[in-house]
Amino acid sequence: MSLVLKKSIDDVALKDKKVLIRVDFNVPVKNGEITNDFRIRSALPTIQKVLKEGGSCILMSHLGRPKGARMSDPKPEKGVRGYEEAATLRPVAAALSELLEKKVAFAPDCLNASIYVSKLKRGDVLLLENVRFYTEEGSKKEEEADAMAKVLASYADLYVSDAFGTAHRDSATMTGIPKVLGSGYAGYLMEKEINYFSRVLNNPPRPLVAIVGGAKVSDKIELLDNMLGRINYLVIGGAMAYTFQKAQGRKIGISMCEEDKLDLAKSLLKKAQERGVQVLLPVDHVCNKEFKAVDSPLVTEDVDVPDGYMALDIGPKTIHMYEEVIGRCKSAIWNGPMGVFEMPCYSKGTFAVAKAMGTGTQKDGLLSIIGGGDTASAAELSGEAKNMSHVSTGGGASLELLEGKTLPGVAILTDKEVKGRGPLLKCACGGASPSNESCPRRREGIWGGGFIVTEIVKLVGALLIGIFIGRRLNTKLIR
């Protein structure tokens, strides 16, 4: 993806404005209680900015995958179209109210909220009900998505996107509304996400290691292919490692393996070798005969998995090897766990990687980025999330960004016009970069070494021209 500088909420007046903010409040809810409020907390800086500047917030989000109803469907006698108890955002309104320490109004129908919007005053916050209760939100038919977008756009003066987690979706609330309003601004979370990914993809401190795990090679093909041209080390773990190991002729027992992807695995390993990327695969394993937790799983002595056993985590030798590689790198990006970390007996590999990255970040200045989804959950569970440079809120979005794809929800936002070269430059991704630490292009001077050389050449050229003209004038005067 070409990451282009985008206008943010710092670039627009917010006073007395009704600001429609697309947030990602797709949080886990159990028995009406939110079990992890990370995504809600991540949106607070943007909300607080609008309130501080004298605007009012209209928040919209999805939660889960409700079946939904069409806008044209008959309205039920009680309730709203498409409503599902398990997917209501009402618990989120209560949680947000506690975090903001102020009342958060709730509109039970996102497309019939005009009366709630009309009552908004400076500093007020309104949360709309789940936008996915209407199928038009994710409709592939442009006219349907546009119809929903027009209703939502009518509520507001400005549109702000802070939902990086759904930035890979071309939907009514991500792309339709800014199209209707003619502009769209990045919130602080969106800005931060793109800034960090731009840095690690475009100009990372080196060496750079990509740690890739998860179940299937097929899920990470595009990521691996795109990253091979950017990284120095590739660390592979999780079930996908055993497709690579079988491709190398190793014994993998009954471990998960994509038989139809063996040639692809060989091809990726060959490409890595051609590009000078060192690939590291597990050299020992934590195994069991069944996919279940046990008190004492088998730890192999070498790379081969015994017959009748499946590998469910990386072993201690592999952990040590991976820790050493992370320790010698300046940047690390991690997408996918090393094992079945949800079971404590198979969590050591994943948690060790998290610990190595967290320690490296705090002690040695490692640029560490966690790619959302299960990896973010693992980092949280390990207690190391707080020590990372950045933990992404977007699983699918971060994956597509690492695959080199364009994110529709980012591309639609208003481009930033950069005039001249001020002292505070911004990263080409849309993130503010007021310091050398946060902007990749400023680590070697204002625009890197190339810029400095160019300026020196210009100065020398101007000096030589001046000397030449001066000599000609002196010659004429003497004559």
UniProtKB/Swiss-Prot annotation:
Positions with a binding annotation for CDP: 214, 219, 238, 336, 341
Annotated ADP binding sites: 214-215, 220, 238, 311, 335, 341-342, 374-375
Primary localization class, coarse: other
GO terms for MF: ADP binding; ATP binding; metal ion binding; phosphoglycerate kinase activity
GO terms classed as biological process: gluconeogenesis; glycolytic process
Reactions accelerated catalytically: (2R)-3-phosphoglycerate + ATP = (2R)-3-phospho-glyceroyl phosphate + ADP
Binding positions for Mg(2+) per the UniProt entry: 215, 219, 374
Keyword ATP-binding included in the entry's annotation: yes
Residues that coordinate or bind AMP: 215-216, 220, 239, 311, 342
Pathway participation: Carbohydrate degradation; glycolysis; pyruvate from D-glyceraldehyde 3-phosphate: step 2/5
SUPFAM superfamilies reported in the protein's UniProt record: Phosphoglycerate kinase
List of residues binding ATP: 215, 220, 239, 311, 342, 374-375
Enzyme Commission number(s) of this protein: 2.7.2.3
Single GO cellular component term: cytosol
Cofactor annotation: Mg(2+)
Keywords linked to the UniProt accession: ATP-binding, Glycolysis, Glycosome, Kinase, Magnesium, Metal-binding, Nucleotide-binding, Peroxisome, Transferase
Subcellular location per the Swiss-Prot or TrEMBL entry: Glycosome
PROSITE patterns given in the database record: PGLYCERATE_KINASE
Family: Belongs to the phosphoglycerate kinase family.
Quaternary structure and interacting proteins, as annotated: Monomer.
Protein name: Phosphoglycerate kinase, glycosomal
Species annotation: Leishmania mexicana
